[in-house]
Amino acid sequence: MKTLNDLFEETLKDIYYAEKAIVKALPKMAKKASSEELASAFTTHVEETQGQIERLEEIFGILGKPARGKKCPAIEGLIEEASEIMKEAEDDTVRDAGMLSAAQAVEHYEISRYGTLKAWAEKLELDDVASLLDETLEEEKATDLKLTDLAESEINLAADNDDEEEEAPKPKRVAAKKKK
């Protein structure tokens, strides 16, 4: 890569790969979710992500480039983390909290990438491309806010209540540790 344009195109390939990987992972997460609201959020985001993939394909077309991805180790790591949570969490509500956290990590990655791509598109005077990237950026921010609201209003509370129920017989040991 020698120019900002080269870097822009490589990063575009990265996020294209990421979106394609996300659209495959979300249905698995929806299936594992015990919360109907969380499952619905994941399912809704699949549809939104498919629209974002189409928007990226439109951007590649504007640039006169083929729409193709470039392996993205960052998204693979985030998806692997979600997979581990789905396998290892023994409690449904804890699994939901972990999957929601993993989904937000993905959202934050996407927000970072789309924000950077938009800024570069503006610098490169690719106004149509910047507008399309901004549309996706705003969708990602909105999804992150929805996930935060869901975490704070339901998912984390349910997981925390399960912890309290399991740990209720142990308050004397906790108090003894504090005195030391």
Regions found by a protein language model. Give the residues of each.
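Amphipathic alpha-helical hairpins
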Residues: 1-180
